[in-house]
Amino acid sequence: MINKTRHNARRYALQALYQWFFCETKPDALISQFMEEHDLSDTEVAYFKEVVTGTIQHVAIIDELMTAHLDRKISALNPVELSVLRLSIYELLHRKEVPYKVVIDEALELVKEFGAEAGHKYVNAILDVLSSEIRKGV
């Protein structure tokens, strides 16, 4: 069963990170703008803020972890899939209370909704390997 408010937080976080991909706005400004433009009443707002800020703050480490498992340069990734991967890797690293299967399932739902037709297969393959590496022993 999906936690709807947490799912919405991830959904909006993906949209914010996608926007950040193109304009690299500072996290606080991006979050403020996003909250002004969207109704987040059905969303876990604190989680939204944390994952957006945290993903942006740790993007270099996240990208480094991801790059080892890509079959192409990071710049060649679809921006939606890249944003989903970054968000999910942040959760795997910093939200250990969230089961890795939930992180992957949520990522796949987001890619199916916003990404390319077969993008979920690519994202699943990368997150499957990374979740084992990041969460080993957890």
From Swiss-Prot:
What domain of life? Bacteria
Pfam families on file: NusB
Q: Which GO terms describe its biological process?
A: DNA-templated transcription termination; transcription antitermination
Please give the InterPro entries that the UniProt record associates with this protein: NusB-like_sf, NusB_fam, NusB_RsmB_TIM44
Keywords, in A-Z order: RNA-binding, Transcription, Transcription antitermination, Transcription regulation
Q: Where are the transmembrane segments?
A: none
Q: Has UniProt tagged this entry with the keyword Calcium?
A: no
Q: Which GO terms describe its cellular component?
A: cytosol
Q: Name the Gene3D superfamilies for this protein.
A: NusB-like
Q: Which GO terms describe its molecular function?
A: RNA binding
- Family label: Belongs to the NusB family.
The free-text function statement in the UniProt record for this protein reads: Involved in transcription antitermination. Required for transcription of ribosomal RNA (rRNA) genes. Binds specifically to the boxA antiterminator sequence of the ribosomal RNA (rrn) operons.
Known NCBIfam families for this protein? Answer: nusB
Descriptive protein name: Transcription antitermination protein NusB
Query: Which species is this UniProt entry from?
Result: Coxiella burnetii (strain CbuK_Q154) (Coxiella burnetii (strain Q154))
- In the UniProt record, what gene is named as encoding this protein? nusB
